[in-house]
Amino acid sequence: MNFWNNFAAKHPAAAKWVREGGLFVIVSNLITVFKYLLLQFLPKAFASLPVVDFGWPGIDITLFGETFKWNILGYDAAHGGLPYFCAYMIAMVIGECINFPIQRNFVFRSKGNLAKQIGWYVLAFCVITCIVNSINCIWMAVAGLFVPAFIYNIGTVVLNGGISMVIFFFVNKIIFPEGAQAK
């Protein structure tokens, strides 16, 4: 502890980045595990929905002999379609609803304007989700050829969590300034 206290006293800005970064990674990884657990049962909860292509823009792509629809948002029927998309989005939204207050209040210690922070966080979530999903639909199609669903779901949440974590750290640094709200 003495080393850390000395480091923090000599380099307060660096110590803040290390503390926030470390806590951010821990919280984000715990949320990622939680999302993975949700994806183990949520697709079954939507099994009664029709398994139809549900995505945009739905461009046909062939990789490793597997033809699938590339989507920025959603999945083709062969890779879960509407039921998987519903399960995936619910897992992501629940995870972020838990993540937001922990990151805001505990990790970044922000007291900023809550409504603005929620708005920016939701916007960032939507943009990041589109980026990640456009990569994830390729991952699911290719990984689905080689491994069972519980394995590619690990890849799905690690991909989602990893890319999201990197982007969200910098987004959160901006939208969650530490300290009291400016008047």
Indicate where each model-derived feature is located:
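Alpha-helical membrane-protein topology signature
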Residues: 1-183
